[in-house]
Swiss-Prot record:
It is found in: Cytoplasm, Cytoskeleton. It comes from the Eukaryota. Residues 198-220 have a biased composition (Basic and acidic residues). Microtubule-associated protein that may be involved in cross-linking microtubules. This is I/6 autoantigen. InterPro entries: EF-hand-dom_pair (IPR011992), EF_hand_dom (IPR002048). It comes from Trypanosoma brucei brucei. Sequence repeats lie at residues 181-188, 189-196, 197-204, 205-212, 213-220, 221-228. Residues 110-145 form the EF-hand domain.
Amino acid sequence: MLCPPDVAFEKRHFKRRDGNKVVPPSIALVAGLESGFLFKLSAVEDVARRGQFPGLLTEDGFLLMCEESEHIRDAYAMAKHLVALAPDGIFTRATLQEAAGKVGSTQDTLSVEEVDALFNALDSDNRGYVSVDEFMDALYGEEGREAMREIRREYMRRKIEVEGEPSWRMRPTPKPTRKLRQKRKREQGQKRKQGQRQKQEQGQRQKREQGQRQKQEQGQKRKRERGGAQRPPPPKQKAGCGC
């Protein structure tokens, strides 16, 4: 969520050797965003130039800028600003450098060193990019995420008004042509014939196997019968003498 200006300054400052807390102008831009203020670089540099330590902002100088600036409490307004800065949804060093080059006044153009400092302050996890959604979530919570979704929906509505409906929505599912229907019909007929042929071959194979089994059984039966006819009769027992 948005934090008070003094908390944002405390989070981003560094200490000089004399113990004074300061921030460079590029980091003051980040602290301003985190507390709900959009500063112009030229205005920040002007305050830093006239401050106690030329080129740096003290806490008093930063808080004074916040008091004199309009606070962006509306998540929707902040989302519009960030979408204009990063339309693809992420900040990279190149994104910030390009955005700095597009600023109308040359006074507000960030140098390469300032872009690096600004990006390093935003990319605290060293991932190489900063998600706009994550940034809005950190500032406004669910309200920030919903604002980003609304901005994107509005962008799509405007794009459709200019370019028309996306082609994947406009183009209906094509109906099969006569040639395609005939092709499908031939394929289905071939599948049916193939199935009938396989069924017929299976029946013939089963019939042959059954005939062979019957033939084997009959041969074994005849063999057993012939063996029984050729066996000699058992010998007769002689009558006893009665002694």
